[in-house]
Amino acid sequence: MARGSAVAWAALGPLLWGCALGLQGGMLYPQESPSRECKELDGLWSFRADFSDNRRRGFEEQWYRRPLWESGPTVDMPVPSSFNDISQDWRLRHFVGWVWYEREVILPERWTQDLRTRVVLRIGSAHSYAIVWVNGVDTLEHEGGYLPFEADISNLVQVGPLPSRLRITIAINNTLTPTTLPPGTIQYLTDTSKYPKGYFVQNTYFDFFNYAGLQRSVLLYTTPTTYIDDITVTTSVEQDSGLVNYQISVKGSNLFKLEVRLLDAENKVVANGTGTQGQLKVPGVSLWWPYLMHERPAYLYSLEVQLTAQTSLGPVSDFYTLPVGIRTVAVTKSQFLINGKPFYFHGVNKHEDADIRGKGFDWPLLVKDFNLLRWLGANAFRTSHYPYAEEVMQMCDRYGIVVIDECPGVGLALPQFFNNVSLHHHMQVMEEVVRRDKNHPAVVMWSVANEPASHLESAGYYLKMVIAHTKSLDPSRPVTFVSNSNYAADKGAPYVDVICLNSYYSWYHDYGHLELIQLQLATQFENWYKKYQKPIIQSEYGAETIAGFHQDPPLMFTEEYQKSLLEQYHLGLDQKRRKYVVGELIWNFADFMTEQSPTRVLGNKKGIFTRQRQPKSAAFLLRERYWKIANETRYPHSVAKSQCLENSLFT
């Protein structure tokens, strides 16, 4: 396979649609248990960007065959982080092509000597195309950032005498093309009076910086050779009882026994089961409720799965514990229901974005963001515009923050992006998203795209197929995409369960004219609802605001203008939110980095918080509104009386 093209995927050879190890089996979050161990590889890795003209030197010289430092200089690179903002090298910040990471690891002796132990290498995210070598052996490839992939490397570490070190080499290409998600194009600038020979730029069609690298944790973990591969849980409610339906996949042997226990928050066993599938009934159930919707939100049970099996080397056992929230989701023509009760999304859109670390996962930032969400009175957010780290989803389960889980289908702006290769890849990405996040009670809806060119006929077929595929993967949740098209021309809207609309009245349209917002917003809602008869979420609205800019009367880019724009939107939303508008998500939670342009001052400034998480004036306005909305319907019902409506769609 030819690899290492400067800017195009064509030289990579055929993409591995599902044949790579990283796309097989389950994707349970790694955890330690009596049968499992984890070894995190976060920290400093050796790093090199391939600045050669064709970006292929690393493959031509086979950098993966020996330690990276032997083939040239390396620098320290923290993992997890984006590589772009770590150094003072301007070339690296805007680099397009292959970068190389390497780390040497000493393994515990038991991992290499006990043949009943399976050793797995897991990469939380590598944006965007990754090739992995272990001790110079080509082990794994994966296309697409923002999602985990892994490989069983037991046969590489359990050979001969104990290897003193394990060398992991990862090459990552961040090039975006018409068949990647998100898509992009490469433009060669050939006027030699302005540009040197071979000069090119990466064009993107989305408004956030294309950070890249090992942006989430890398780790090794073990399981027995016969192991719990995957668990799928769906829940429902029957009078005052909760029903937990489970399916368990086991790999490595057909001779095994499974025991299942469901424990409540006090670690008391409330139900038992056996076998690979079954139903657990929980009398007097404590439901999983969103934040501010119940006096005890985010109630989680623990599903404990114990496997015992016979192998040729003797008996083995495996243990895995899955948090379970028992709740229902349903959609009617005018309501979004959680546990049979109307739910109103009052929340934010976010980005995984911060100073220095870029899109790199960071625990302090995560906790700070959730503290701000709760202070704000937000009960929901959309993972705009890609799946967030698994730790984020776990926090949502624990805190009761509802999630619209969006894939990286952003920037689908050109007709050539709606091709069969892209469609195949998009459907596979949705498989990976659902596989990873299907058991999170906080996830109540899938979003397959943001602002696609949904007025195109080709987009209509494309979206129809992706939505249908997602529904086949998970019939228990509604599916949407986020539109900014005209209601009469949108070819994808007939296939969604909930209409999600982005509009920027008085900003991108009729900018400066705050007095038009209420009329234009009312017209928008009425047109969409009359045509489609589906609940509507105002999925984006907002205004660019430079913290500390003030002007009265309000002028654009000032804090006063952002506040005034929000106030006008809120008046318009209040006219419809007791009818068929079921949510509002501000754009954006915090300022974030974008590509440089004459219209962006160090990034997008539509946040109600700065990039450093300090509030602008609008944050206090939004906090007052969200707490007011929450208090209108706060704790109006008991758990025992909460049931999903019989005529709802997703039970």
UniProtKB/Swiss-Prot annotation:
The active site is at E451 (proton donor). Residues 1-22 form the signal peptide. Its EC number is 3.2.1.31. Glycans are attached at N173, N272, N420, N631. Inhibited by L-aspartic acid. N-linked glycosylated with 3 to 4 oligosaccharide chains. GO terms for biological process: carbohydrate metabolic process; chondroitin sulfate proteoglycan catabolic process; glycosaminoglycan catabolic process; heparan sulfate proteoglycan catabolic process; hyaluronan catabolic process. One of its GO terms (cellular component) is extracellular space. Coiled coil: none annotated. Changing R577L: In MPS7; loss of activity. Its main location: other. GO terms for molecular function: beta-glucuronidase activity; carbohydrate binding; protein domain specific binding; signaling receptor binding. It catalyses: a beta-D-glucuronoside + H2O = D-glucuronate + an alcohol. Gene3D superfamilies: Galactose-binding domain-like, Glycosidases, Immunoglobulins. Keywords: Disease variant, Glycoprotein, Glycosidase, Hydrolase, Lysosome, Mucopolysaccharidosis, Signal. The keyword Aminoacyl-tRNA synthetase does not apply. It is found in: Lysosome. Belongs to the glycosyl hydrolase 2 family. Homotetramer. It is linked to Mucopolysaccharidosis 7: A form of mucopolysaccharidosis, a group of lysosomal storage diseases characterized by defective degradation of glycosaminoglycans, resulting in their excessive accumulation and secretion. The diseases are progressive and often display a wide spectrum of clinical severity. MPS7 is an autosomal recessive form with a highly variable phenotype, ranging from severe lethal hydrops fetalis to mild forms with survival into adulthood. Most patients with the intermediate phenotype show hepatomegaly, skeletal anomalies, coarse facies, and variable degrees of mental impairment. Plays an important role in the degradation of dermatan and keratan sulfates. This is Beta-glucuronidase. The gene is GUSB.
